[in-house]
Amino acid sequence: MKISDLDTPVLMIDEAALDRNIARMKDLTSEAGVFYRPHAKTHKSVEIARRQIAAGAVGICCAKLGEAEVMAAGGIDNILITTAVVGESKVGRLIHARNSARIAVVADNADNIAMLGNVAQMSGQKLDVLVEVDIGQGRAGVPAAAEAAGLAKLIHDHGWLNFAGIQGYQGKIQM
């Protein structure tokens, strides 16, 4: 079959280039002595996520709960949802997805932390929560260190939540 015979639009992946890029990321992070968790928002592919994890990634980031559900259903068992999970309608979905994967979430306000605590308690499983901090882009997260510290304490003091660190996003810095 010739490329011109393909019905478009069509997704095509140069597997050799994909594997080189995954290996390069592994090498860069190994040399730096850090763990890495690639974001699946570009590829949205369970198969590519599996390859990244097989090459040393500790898990996958997903922008939304729906993406995390797809990854969990596909066997990816360590997921960070990088935007706040908000709204009662998503509570049941988050609990269900946590039955097949370790899912961590971010929060940037006390109300969201309280809701996440309820989710964890209803599921009978502690939930890892990162505080999202604004690192200068004005996009998301708490703007002040004192506020972030207060939220971290709120998470730490909750019986069903584990404070798992901080997250910041700087869209101008891409690798």
Each model region followed by its residue ranges:
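Generic N-terminal amphipathic, Lys/Arg-enriched alpha-helix
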Residues: 1-13
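N-terminal glycine-rich anion-binding loops that anchor highly charged ligand groups
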Residues: 17-48, 61-63
